């Protein structure tokens, strides 16, 4: 009997050791993956659209881009990363702050930031993977604007502080809404874009509650029609629903759109066939156009959104479009 118990003990010990090894290996693999770039540098070459304008703005701009990184004292932020046009010319560029989706960091999507900066923007991100409250976005904005005033900084005088956009995806969509509405520096932002921002009740349950009625800057909100964004269950106000309605159902976009006052330029639209995880790349073109229009005064980019003949209204890749300008 003692021999049997001894064998059982050895087996249990081996199983426990194996579990520990698997946990350690998985932790190491996760840590390595978290520091990897997840998409190729030329990811934008795969973008497809029937709209010449959307395809144009999903590509590269005219500027060569330089990247800088800064260590943050905030462990959640980890590193602040900045991409900007690498020109000898002494001039300022509009700023775009990107708020990460869940479990995503700027380091994982470097080509996305670099592509956007090539259109003449200072693009700012950080490595926070839980961004929904908007706090780290607000802190990151303060940090880079201080660099803009620091004569010893490589970024001294490069940022146009009168033109600052905020872009957020998924959880980061909630974070972007909070960034432009909840903080002392929220009034620095002049334009907002979100891709599949998590619906209001989901955000509240997760601790990222937002209030769209406080938005007073132009806002372009998007989502996908795929089941991960909209599962067809329109009940977004009850925690008792048996089926998850998706991260950003159409009902959520309608509610958020209607919750913003009519004097604010607002657009809601969905990417036909897009699943939640595809939204960052699927919206690249029109997100860039939205920023060019509002931050650089680009009239061609404005034609994507403004008027009865706006490009977005005739683009078969988009549906459920509602706008007030």
Predicted segments with their positions:
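N-terminal Sec-pathway targeting helices
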Residues: 1-20
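Alpha/beta-hydrolase-fold serine-hydrolase catalytic core, especially in secreted/extracellular enzymes
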Residues: 2, 29, 33, 271-325
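Gly/Ser-rich "nucleophile elbow"/oxyanion-hole loop immediately N-terminal to the catalytic nucleophile
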Residues: 87-92, 135-174, 182-183
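Hydrolases whose catalytic domains are alpha/beta-hydrolase-1, hotdog thioesterase
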Residues: 175-179, 203
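The feature captures the conserved acid-bearing segment of alpha/beta-hydrolase catalytic domains
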Residues: 190-279
């Amino acid at each position: 009997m003692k021999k049997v118990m001894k064998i059982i003990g050895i087996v249990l010990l081996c199983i426990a050791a194996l579990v520990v090894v698997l946990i350690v290996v998985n932790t190491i693999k996760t840590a390595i993956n978290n520091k990897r770039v997840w998409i190729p540098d030329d990811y934008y070459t795969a973008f497809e659209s029937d709209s010449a304008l959307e395809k144009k703005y999903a590509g590269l701009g005219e500027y060569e881009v330089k990247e800088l990184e800064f260590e943050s004292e905030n462990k959640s932020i980890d590193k602040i990363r900045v991409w900007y046009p690498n020109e000898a010319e002494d001039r300022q560029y509009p700023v775009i702050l990107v708020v990460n989706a869940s479990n995503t960091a700027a380091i994982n999507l470097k080509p996305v930031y670099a592509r956007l900066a090539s259109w003449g923007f200072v693009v700012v991100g950080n490595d926070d993977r839980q961004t929904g409250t908007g706090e780290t976005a607000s802190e990151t904005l303060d940090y880079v604007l201080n660099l803009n005033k620091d004569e010893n900084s490589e970024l001294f005088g490069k940022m146009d502080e009168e033109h600052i956009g905020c872009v957020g995806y998924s959880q980061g969509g909630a974070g972007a809404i909070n960034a432009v509405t909840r903080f002392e520096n929220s009034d620095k932002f002049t334009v907002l874009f979100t891709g599949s921002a998590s619906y209001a009740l989901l955000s509240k349950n997760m601790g990222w509650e937002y209030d769209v009625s406080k938005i007073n800057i132009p806002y372009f909100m998007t989502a996908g029609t795929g089941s991960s964004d909209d599962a067809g269950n329109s009940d977004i106000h009850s925690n008792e629903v048996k089926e998850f309605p998706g991260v950003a159902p159409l009902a959520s976009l309608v509610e958020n759109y209607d919750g913003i006052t009519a004097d604010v330029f607002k657009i809601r639209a969905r990417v036909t066939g897009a699943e939640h995880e595809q939204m960052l790349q699927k919206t690249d073109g029109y997100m860039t156009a939205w920023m060019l229009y509002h931050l650089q005064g680009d009239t061609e980019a404005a034609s994507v959104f403004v008027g009865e003949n706006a490009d977005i209204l005739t683009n078969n890749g988009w549906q459920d479009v509602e706008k007030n300008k």
